[in-house]
Amino acid sequence: MSSLYLAEVDAFLQSPRTRHRTCADLRRELDAYADEERREAAKAIAHPDRPLLAPPSAPPDRSRPAPRGTAHPPAASP
């Protein structure tokens, strides 16, 4: 959650008077913050030069069995 979003909620809850704001007003502002964050996230995800996830690496070659000396360690007992 964005710090702006949390700051807005905190200001609303901590204020002795809500400055004539209603819950509907607060909800409208918070929805606007959330929409803006979604738009920014969509831009970041779709950015071709700066992808959020690295491209997948090549999967290991499973056509050949592993050498005999590379067995997995035994599972730890509880």
UniProtKB/Swiss-Prot annotation:
One of its GO terms (biological process) is symbiont-mediated suppression of host antigen processing and presentation. Keywords: Early protein, Host cytoplasm, Host nucleus, Host-virus interaction, Inhibition of host adaptive immune response by virus, Inhibition of host TAP by virus, Viral immunoevasion. It comes from the Viruses. The keyword Cell division does not apply. It is found in: Host cytoplasm; Host nucleus. GO terms for cellular component: host cell cytoplasm; host cell nucleus. Residues 38-50 have a biased composition (Basic and acidic residues). Residues 3-36 are annotated as: Active domain. Belongs to the herpesviridae US12 family. This is ICP47 protein. It comes from Cercopithecine herpesvirus 16. The gene is US12.
